[in-house]
Amino acid sequence: MGLIQENHRYSYSQLQSVSECPYGFYLQKIEKADGLVQNAFASQGTLIHDILDEWAKGILTIDQMPQEYERRYPLEVTQSWPRVLAVKGYAQKAFDLGYAYLKNFDGFPGYRIVDAEQKFETDIFGRPFVGIIDMLLEDEETGDLIVLDHKSKSLTAFKKAEDEMYKQQYLYAKHVFEKYDKWPKRLMFNLFKEGGLKRERPFKQDEYE
């Protein structure tokens, strides 16, 4: 059997894995090899993603978000942090950064939430592609659509991978056009470990093509 299955539906992270190490992708996603586990960084990111999604859908109020994070953190972030970080007290720092972000969260003023955690399937270069748009926003003044992705990266780490991050947004923009018959005007990232710092670029048709 080949490492890449014809009928497999790819996410953006999986496309990256295939590009960087096809065999590693095969073991993790196709064979589901033992020993390849979620890490604490990913678990914390998933928890904050989920809480933001529940707020966007009206399941949680803004006031409930930090308490929900505090309650679920020990239940969902169960992995150990890397030793080199743990000895420096990073585990507590990571928790505190997430809590502070949610405690000070004030929504997305000036924007209307069109959809949250929007899962979709489309075709990329003849292969099935599956993605999840964290939030699709509409500018209340202009009516422009904005693709928003929540990221747990620090600003330094984000800058190192910034161009690659925006490639993901361009793939998501394809779905926005297919569903809403117009392209998003802006591609935005919400860096919640940086207090909700926003990084964005305008959508450019020539870069998409």
Which residues fall in each region the model found?
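An acidic intrinsically disordered interaction segment
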Residues: 2, 6-20, 127-138
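Short amphipathic alpha-helical segments and their helix-coil junctions
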Residues: 1, 5-7, 22-35, 72-73, ...
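Hydrophobic (often cysteine-bearing) scaffold residues that line and stabilize catalytic clefts
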Residues: 40, 44, 48, 90, ...
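A non-catalytic, helix-rich entry segment at domain boundaries
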Residues: 50-119, 123
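Short, solvent-exposed segments of well-ordered alpha helices
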Residues: 9, 39, 160-163
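Short, compositionally biased low-complexity segments
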Residues: 18-26, 60-78, 184-194
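Nuclease catalytic cores
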Residues: 12-60, 117
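Mg2+/Mn2+-dependent nuclease catalytic core
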Residues: 111-114, 118-209
